[in-house]
Curated annotation (Swiss-Prot):
UniProt name for this protein: Glycerol kinase
Pfam families listed in its UniProt record: FGGY_C, FGGY_N
Associated pathway: Polyol metabolism; glycerol degradation via glycerol kinase pathway; sn-glycerol 3-phosphate from glycerol: step 1/1
EC class name: transferase
Lineage start: Bacteria, Bacillati, Bacillota, Bacilli, Bacillales
Binding site for sn-glycerol 3-phosphate: 12, 82-83, 134, 244
One biological process term in Gene Ontology: glycerol-3-phosphate metabolic process
Protein's organism: Bacillus cereus (strain Q1)
Activation/inhibition comment: Activated by phosphorylation and inhibited by fructose 1,6-bisphosphate (FBP).
GO molecular function: ATP binding; glycerol kinase activity
UniProt PTM: The phosphoenolpyruvate-dependent sugar phosphotransferase system (PTS), including enzyme I, and histidine-containing protein (HPr) are required for the phosphorylation, which leads to the activation of the enzyme.
Gene assigned in the entry: glpK
Phosphohistidine, modified sites: 230
Binding site for ADP: 12, 16, 266, 309, 410, 414
Annotated function: Key enzyme in the regulation of glycerol uptake and metabolism. Catalyzes the phosphorylation of glycerol to yield sn-glycerol 3-phosphate.
EC number(s) reported in the record: 2.7.1.30
Amino acid sequence: MKKYILSLDQGTTSSRAILFNKKGEIVHSAQKEFTQHFPKPGWVEHNAQEIWGSILAVIATCLSEADVKPEQIAGIGITNQRETAVVWDKTTGKPIYNAIVWQSRQTAEICDELKEKGYSEMVREKTGLLIDAYFSGTKVKWILDNVEGAREKAENGDLLFGTIDTWLVWKLSGGKAHVTDYSNASRTLMFNIHDLQWDDELLDMLTVPKSMLPEVRPSSEVYGETIDYHFFGQNVPIAGVAGDQQAALFGQACFGEGMAKNTYGTGCFMLMNTGEKAVASEHGLLTTIAWGIDGKVNYALEGSIFVAGSAIQWLRDGMRMFKDASESEVYASRVESTDGVYVVPAFVGLGTPYWDSEVRGAMFGVTRGTTKEHFIRATLESLAYQTKDVLCAMEADSGIELKTLRVDGGAVKNNFLMKFQSDILDVPVERPVINETTALGAAYLAGLAVGYWKNQDEIKEQWHMDKRFEPTMEAEISEELYAGWKKAIEATKAFK
């Protein structure tokens, strides 16, 4: 009896395997962290083999602890840290360099050159993205330009490229399936989101051979099966793939046009479903593909904040202000306000709507009376201000006024932050019972492909609210606070 869907959630700092049942409930999960490599300031890399090892480990742990046999699994859904690029040898299956992570700024110079050559408008029109080190295309170019012999091998058709989803499907299927889905392809800087094809003009710009690229498929279909020895003697269908933020939008059942979610993970990502039309942004947002399912493609507007949960980690590990991230709420609640203190956590630059990779973090309004509590509160508040920056851009571009914001990710457990978020946005914030919406979205996509769930209506019924945070702050106060944040941003940008 096929009782479960297995979701593999390959994130920036850890890999997880989560088993879901028919009601969309978590049966069991396992997690394993892996090494972050920082070869130079601003560079972030992962070992793709270590990521693969961590995936095998969490599958084994999750199934054995839950006492679930592989033959009870109806299908596998995969969701992944997006943009992170892997290039590997087709024959040996070994990566030729570390995976270059989405956060890494090592291709900033390549991006500057492309902008100087006047490619920005063409890239914007075709991909919905900006020329930025964040996206995969320049990472692939960097690997081909900097690893000895790589370009020659690529031109001979001996190398393969993939985002993490592609790497995992390739490994799980024993090298049979070299595929990605629309949502991940739309983040590469090489994919035309309107005609849904790899784009020759973009590939020429980046000097990336087409033979390296995976086949682009819908987000919900059977791409292949696991090979026996990776899945303990069973061929299980690999049936759903979506980038982490798009998977969360799906897991939050944001199927209607104008519905939006914000995920508070390492970074913060807000996506609004714009239906079957790609809305071009005038305000520094990205136009991206949400998912492809049932022969249709849905688009989304996205705002990306580079530093969110990682700011809380920095308070814990870098500043040693507390031992556990959950303590940040306790400290922040001990003071009535930040007493005029603002923290701008631009550790790796600023994302939407500013897109400035040269800016670094800053703190303003500090006095002799500033305490640890003020500092922690100001850091938490910065997540809410950055989210408001994104929402203002979204409402301006889409012409849709947000009614409620659905939230997920590690930081949403923080009630102080969620209440402040609602106050600053002046809209209700809804936290679901199942916070693992990214993994759930991948599970839903896989389950729909194998007939485990009937349709999106059945899934919509499974979304349940844990808590709704209503705005109660006076408009005058929230506007004043936000004006202070805008001043802090301008001052941060001036200091370069």
